[in-house]
Amino acid sequence: MPPLRLTSVLHTALPDLSENGRALLSVLGCFNGHPPCSHELAQWLGFHDRYQLARALRREGLPPLEVIGGWARTLYWMSEAEGSGKSLRELAEREKVDPAIAYRLVRRVTGRRWSEVRREGLALTMLRFRDRCAKAAPRPTANLGTPPFLLAAGDPIPRPPAATTRPIRSTWRGAETRARTTLARPGHRVVQGISERVAVDGAPFDVAFAASGEALVTRPHAAAVDVLQLNPFGVSHTIRVGPTPTRVIPTARNGKNGHVAYVTTQFVEAVRIIDTERRQMVGSIPVPGHPLSAAMSPDGHTLFVTTNQDRLVAISTAQRTVVGSTAIPLTSPQLTIHPSGRWLLVPCWRAGVIVEVDASTLAITRRFDVGGVVQDVVVAADGQSLYAANEAGWLDVIHLPSGRRTAKLEFGTGALGLATSADQAHLFVGLLEAGRVLILQRQGLIERAVIPTGGRPRLIAPHPAGDGVLVANEAGWVDLLR
């Protein structure tokens, strides 16, 4: 997943911005220079409202959002025109924009006609953009507990509305189920339906259980990680980490730093360190590119992270620095480590392959060609079987000792999230577009239940003791399945 061309252009034009200024440019790059409404953009970057964002832009030395957005749009069209030879009219019509509006936008932000801008070329236009933002300068990182971009605004840390736990009607039981004071232990009982649901805004993506028994949920569109308590089920705290937190990796339950978790925050190009006891961010580890997925070595000494520069990097958790890296084709937000700790299994998204990497040398040892668009992967506790969800509509099973695919189960719809139950008896598969979670008996891949969650179920976290399963849903909630 290489960097978007517009993102690279913007970062090249303004190389000296703070990490949060670069995060703003990354968001503009994601939307081809046409960001969502200013309020939504403010939420992505961790601000309370658009006014706070505007004040931060002024302190960062950047022009108003309307101006910088217009320049980003113009640079996008310039980049596309040079790459494809298309006219501005063709580019505008492709995006369902009135060509007259596009021509006026270019004239307004650059002071020149499109024909003049095209003759000057992209490089000179980038220089003019840099000159327009000449006051931009790097800003020092103040308190790590609060995003520097937020501190620059001089405003208090915003508190999101309290999430609510509400009763829902279970499709499988046909009766209303309310929050209970204790959670039942299902053991080997198959999960039957949704027990409870808590509203979580910001497009929840990943969910994982911390050593304390609480759960951590990443909110990419809210620049935060929420702490979920199970009894009663709800959000207890919010930890601000910076734009686009994607994966969260708590340390081992029996480790000396069991209260620490690592969060890949894409647009600040760093892995954040949070303390789940103190409920705050306590550190940051810069990485080359936007960090996507992560996995911790069994001994807790090394954190492995993939980035959008198509690289796998190894981070020393003691030194808090990158100690090694290797090239990986088309990385994605998914990654897992073999129970032995000897190998990493890295899905390569649209490349349709999974690569096995030696954890000590970062050398690629094997490739498994499965086709499609590989998403989440898990390895059975005995280390014998690799399971891979595929967005093209199936699940692969690979026998790791031999490297052969031993089974393939078709779903007819894209699969994304994947997890094994605490007792290793079942697999949980999130069907993203269908809005369902499929429960399979691991032996024989026999379907045991289908739970309609609605929305867009993302990643899945079974409780280590078997006390239910959490499913992050991009539509704005987290489900507790029992």
Model feature map: region roles:
Residues 163-482:
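Predominantly soluble domains enriched in secretory-pathway, periplasmic, or organellar proteins
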Residues 1-171:
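Alpha-helical bundle regulatory/interaction domains
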